[in-house]
A protein has these predicted regions:
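Active-site-proximal loop/helix segment associated with metal-binding centers of metalloenzymes
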Residues: 1-103
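Detector for Asparagine
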Residues: 15, 63-64, 71-73, 118, ...
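Conserved catalytic motifs of the protein kinase core domain
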Residues: 31-33, 108, 129
Length: 166
């Protein structure tokens, strides 16, 4: 098998494990990491969650909104901020890159998609928390954007690596 086909098989296996719109893991150094479609902004989570509850609770509450609450919670999950043409608090379905930098949840690393990039990008929030932008396979205005790279975390070394399929 080629390196490219191995990368795609790995991506497919990871996709099969993810259930819901977000999940979390803890790095080997104890840092908690939130993984979601578009990212968590403090203005959106403020009414739903307190950092004292822990990241597990935010993930649980957000996924329950999608998987259990159904249409009752779809309005909350669908809110878009000004960056995406809306007027509400940016939800984890619609948060934009600039909104995350300005108001990403404090104290947590975030790994997100949704904001198209040419390659995986590491950034920081105004609170100096790490943001990884990983949407590298988008289709915009009849052209593709991105190099299909993705992010891998190694808990033995506590390091992230950007993998490219070719």
């Amino acid at each position: 098998a080629t390196k490219s086909s191995a990368v795609y098989r790995l991506r497919d296996r990871v996709n099969a494990l993810v259930d819901g719109i977000c999940w979390k893991f803890t790095q080997s150094d104890g840092q908690e990491v939130a993984c979601s479609h578009a990212g968590f902004c403090s203005s959106w989570v403020r009414k739903l969650w307190s950092p004292s509850e822990g990241l597990d609770k935010l993930v649980e509450k957000t996924n329950n909104m999608l998987l259990k609450d159904g249409n009752h919670s779809m309005g909350k999950l669908s809110t878009a901020g000004r960056e995406r043409g809306g007027f509400g608090c940016p939800s984890p379905c619609w948060a934009g890159e600039h909104e995350l930098r300005a108001e990403g949840i404090k104290g947590f690393t975030q790994i997100v998609g949704h904001s198209a990039q040419n390659t995986v990008v590491k950034s920081k929030t105004v609170n100096n928390d790490v943001l990884w932008f990983c949407d590298t396979h988008s289709w915009l205005t009849n052209t593709t954007r991105g190099d299909d790279s993705f992010l891998m975390y190694d808990d033995n070394t506590n390091k992230y690596t950007v993998l490219k399929p070719y």
